[in-house]
Every structure is written in structure tokens, then in C-alpha cells.
């Protein structure tokens, strides 16, 4: 068996398990739109929230999902968000059905009562986020962050990175000055010198390194996992598992393609993001491909994230991460 054939079998096995019941419906030959019409629904679509980077951006750029779902009479609507927290706000209020975010946004959303479910994740990618300082900064170690102003997007993956970085350095969270800004505003503040450091993720991280010559004080390696999660509203996931199965299968195909075509990935991402190809090539070199079901190990990792925010009273209440899974599809096995 060839490596490429083994990859295809692995992808089919993994994603078949994700929505086995849906696969049975699809195998019966009844298109999704016909099923919807039988339920009295007029239009079937999936509204996808994405950020300006990653597998969903590649999927949008290649147009393969639209072609696949058109065969089932299903439309696709894409909405861009600047960061994970606002994307999940969109999911919670019903403006989108599905999207991808980092580790921390689902924790904040679940603690706020959002009715979302995890449906998959990409592998850990700790080098894709970092705390950076201006090229001429005198800050040399994480301990030097004490008393400093640090720009970050509240409730994002880098919020957790900052917690773990400070913990490693023995600096209390109360002893820094977090400045909560979305990426574009944070970059402006960083360039003006209004903040001393910036916790940020790719491709904004790569842009800061390439365009501003920002210096990495610490990235996520040895501190955080930095998984990328695919989430859906619980209502949509329960009602349309067959559509989500198709979406995740197409995500897996794009992951396989992206892993083997870095130059084409950089070309598509440059066009989609408006960033230079050198910037997105650097960012893409740190990205990990390979969507999987959410395993017990990943859920345990997410629970540690939740507990860290809860211990500092940064979320309104403790949460149990596994409550945000569909019970019949938890797939409580460790990821291979």
C-alpha cells in the first residue's frame, strides 16, 4: 500500500467515524436537499465562519466544497472574522453554523453559555503563536514582562499562551498590564510603541517578523499545544450531521493537499489574505495539517485551558469541556 493510499484510507476511516450515522443516510442515495424538503425546509446551506488564514481559507480559495455540496443541493456562505472570539459570538447568535478557532475561544464561549459543539481539530501547532517585542526592545526574557503593557486579543489562543508564559517566568498575571485589542489595532499600537509586547498568532505573527522585524520573546513550544478546532452550533450539528461530514471530508482533502504543496498554499493564502507570499510562506511552514476527531487527550488538554482561566476568574464559571461534545459521537479514543 502506498503512503498516499494509506493517507486516503486514514482520512476516510477517521471522518467516517465522525458521522457514521450521516454516512448511512448519504449511502442510501438521498441528497441532503431532498431530505430537507421532506422536513419542510425551503433552502439548505451551511454558513461558515473563517479567519484570514488556515485550512478553511485554503478550502474557500480552492472552491472544492461548493462543488461537492452543490451535488447535494446545498449552498455555502462564507463570512470572515478578525479573530476567534467574535467568530464564536456569530455562532452563538446564529449568524453562522460552523467555524474554526484556537484553544481559548471555545472556553470563553462555553463559559458564557454558548451552545456549541466540537466536531474536529487540527494537530498541535505551538510555533504558530508567540509573544513578540520591537526589534530594539530591551526586553530579553519572559521575566522582563513584569509591569509591562502587552497587547493581545482577549479570549483568544494567545491569551492562554500569555498565561503559560508568565507562569513559566514566575510572573503573576496581575503584575502585567494586558491591553485587549484585535490584531489590526494591536499591530498599530505595537508600531507606535504604545505597548511593550504583543501576543499574536500567524499570519499576523509572520507579518510582524517579516515587515516590522519584531523579535520573538517566546513562542508556544513547550508552553501550549495551540490546537485549531472546528466547531458547530449544537442545533446545526444535530440536524445536519451529513453536511458536516462532507465539510470535514473536504477539509481533510485540503489538509492532504496543503501538506504536499507548500508553494501553492503560499500562493493561495497570499491572494486570500493580501499579505506577501514570503509572509504566508513563513506562517504556513509552522502550520500542522491533519483534521482528526476530538480525542480524549485533546479534551483533557482543553480542560487544562479552561481550568487555567477559571482559576484566575477570567471566565464567569468553571466548565466541563466534554459537555460540548455530541454524546453519540464523542469517539473517546486517543488520536493516533
Predicted regions and their residues:
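C-terminal segment of classical bacterial N-terminal signal peptides
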Residues: 23-35
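N-terminal secretory signal peptides and thylakoid transit peptides that target proteins
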Residues: 2-21
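Short, solvent-exposed loop/beta-turn-alpha elements that line the ligand-binding surface or hinge
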Residues: 66-74, 290-298, 321
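Short, glycine-/small- and polar/acidic-enriched structural segments
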Residues: 37-171, 177-180, 196-200, 217, ...
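Pocket-lining segment of extracytoplasmic ligand-binding domains
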Residues: 104, 178-179, 184-271
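Conserved C-terminal helix/tail region of periplasmic/extracytoplasmic solute-binding proteins
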Residues: 307-336
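Secondary-structure end/capping motifs
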Residues: 239-316
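Second-shell loop/turn segments in exported
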Residues: 46, 55, 147-152, 192-195, ...
Amino acid at each position: 500500500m502506498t503512503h498516499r493510499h494509506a493517507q486516503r484510507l486514514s482520512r476516510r476511516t477517521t471522518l467516517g467515524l465522525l458521522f457514521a450515522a450521516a454516512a448511512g443516510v448519504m449511502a442510501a442515495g438521498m441528497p441532503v436537499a431532498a431530505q430537507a424538503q421532506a422536513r419542510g425546509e425551503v433552502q439548505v446551506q451551511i454558513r461558515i465562519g473563517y479567519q484570514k488564514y488556515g485550512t478553511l481559507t485554503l478550502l474557500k480559495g480552492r472552491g472544492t466544497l461548493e462543488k461537492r455540496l452543490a451535488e447535494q443541493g446545498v449552498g455555502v456562505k462564507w463570512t470572515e472574522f478578525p479573530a476567534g472570539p467574535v467568530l464564536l459570538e456569530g455562532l452563538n447568535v446564529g449568524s453562522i453554523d460552523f467555524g474554526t478557532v484556537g484553544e481559548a475561544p471555545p472556553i470563553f464561549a462555553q463559559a458564557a453559555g454558548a451552545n456549541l459543539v466540537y466536531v474536529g481539530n487540527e494537530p498541535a501547532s505551538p510555533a504558530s503563536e508567540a509573544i513578540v517585542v520591537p526589534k530594539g526592545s530591551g526586553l530579553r526574557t519572559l521575566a522582563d514582562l513584569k509591569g509591562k503593557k502587552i497587547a493581545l486579543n482577549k479570549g483568544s489562543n494567545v491569551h492562554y499562551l500569555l498565561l503559560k508564559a508568565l507562569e513559566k517566568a514566575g510572573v503573576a498575571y496581575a503584575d502585567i498590564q494586558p491591553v485587549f485589542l484585535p490584531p489590526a489595532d494591536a499591530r498599530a499600537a505595537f508600531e507606535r510603541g504604545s505597548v511593550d509586547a504583543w501576543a499574536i498568532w500567524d499570519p499576523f505573527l509572520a507579518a510582524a517578523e517579516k515587515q516590522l522585524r519584531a523579535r520573538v520573546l517566546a513562542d508556544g513550544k513547550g508552553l501550549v499545544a495551540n490546537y485549531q478546532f472546528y466547531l458547530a452550533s449544537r442545533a446545526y450539528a444535530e440536524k445536519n450531521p451529513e453536511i458536516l461530514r462532507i465539510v470535514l471530508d473536504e477539509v481533510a482533502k485540503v489538509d492532504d493537499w496543503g501538506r504536499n504543496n507548500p508553494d501553492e498554499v503560499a500562493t493561495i493564502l497570499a491572494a486570500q489574505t493580501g499579505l506577501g507570499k514570503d509572509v504566508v510562506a513563513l506562517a504556513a511552514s509552522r502550520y500542522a495539517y491533519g483534521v482528526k476527531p476530538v480525542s480524549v487527550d485533546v479534551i483533557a488538554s482543553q480542560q487544562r485551558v479552561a481550568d487555567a482561566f477559571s482559576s484566575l476568574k477570567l471566565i464567569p464559571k468553571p466548565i466541563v469541556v466534554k459537555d460540548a461534545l455530541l454524546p453519540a459521537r464523542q469517539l473517546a479514543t486517543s488520536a493516533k
